[in-house]
A protein has these predicted regions:
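Electrostatic, structured charged patches in enzyme active sites and in nucleic-acid/phosphate-binding
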Residues: 1-100
Length: 100
């Protein structure tokens, strides 16, 4: 499988290690519309069906973190029945180093 970023590959391998079922970029959520078309989409990196959560992985690039935080906030507002989680680099490494 091809991933957009190496951190997504590592995250998927750790999910596999813990036998956590995952689906890569399963759904795109429209966030903004205009002139009869979708102007902004949000496609979370992973969906974890057993936990019913959509996960977006982000690195330490502050511009990306801010953009993703805004998209997640808007997605939560537009899709309140969905569970979205942004995992930043430090949370990601804490997860990888945990003994779960």
């Amino acid at each position: 499988m091809s991933f957009a970023h190496y951190s997504e590959k590592i995250f998927s391998e750790h999910l596999d290690l813990f036998n956590i079922q995952w689906i890569y970029e399963p759904t795109s959520f429209p966030l903004k519309w205009g002139s009869g078309s979708i102007k902004m989409m949000f496609t979370p990196d992973f969906y974890l069906p057993e936990l019913d959560v959509y996960v977006e992985i982000t690195t330490m690039n502050q511009n990306l973190i801010t953009k993703k935080q805004k998209k997640i906030k808007l997605a939560k507002k537009l899709y309140p029945n969905k569970n979205f989680k942004l995992i930043n680099e430090s949370q990601f490494y804490n997860f990888l180093n945990s003994d779960n």
